[in-house]
């Protein structure tokens, strides 16, 4: 949402300072970004020349943002994601425009608590750990590498820092992509092929249809359920923390084969996800327990 909100409808100057994506950057250079969405851990950005940018950040990939960044306020709820070819969802999240020196976002599909904050000081904090633009592991390592440069740069366009696979630039916003597992261009058919390989995402599309797909995918496999939940073809984008928590909350042994897990438990897990994941997006944390109280630890 943040890339769509910041760059949507704007003509992009694309380059590959590292050189590994030079041909791809040249093909989208000068195009307008028309849409952007994520399924699981993969991002798909559409351009007006018919090409799609597909990015999978993996473990170490990250986006560094510079200049004017438009974040999304999720405090009132999480909007539905509409896939290509589907009718647009009626709900939406308000955009909150911010201007800051820099920031980071990593791990597509994850959001930070400061998405609902309203001042630059809250967005870019002292160490970046809770910044709306410092999202995804390993945050502290990345922040430690570039804190000085990111915090003090006034040059425009920003100086290239480190290894940048792709830079997307407008007259007021810049995003640098570093270390992704996948960065490629696709046509419409290519996007469909990738989406067809992915399991349902609890944050994307019709939850009821996703539930049926998940139950079917998990129930036919003899693989341990704990392993199945990390298979992106079974369910997209859950991740290790939610996997462990959901299994614990459902009282399911992670070593139990998928085809031995009662259907009622599979459905219980899916419905739990469809509640927990939007909560996590809304508050900017992986929250699996309500009502936690106590003094803040510093």
Language-model segments: what does each one mean?
Residues 1-298:
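Structured catalytic/nucleic-acid-binding cores of DNA maintenance enzymes
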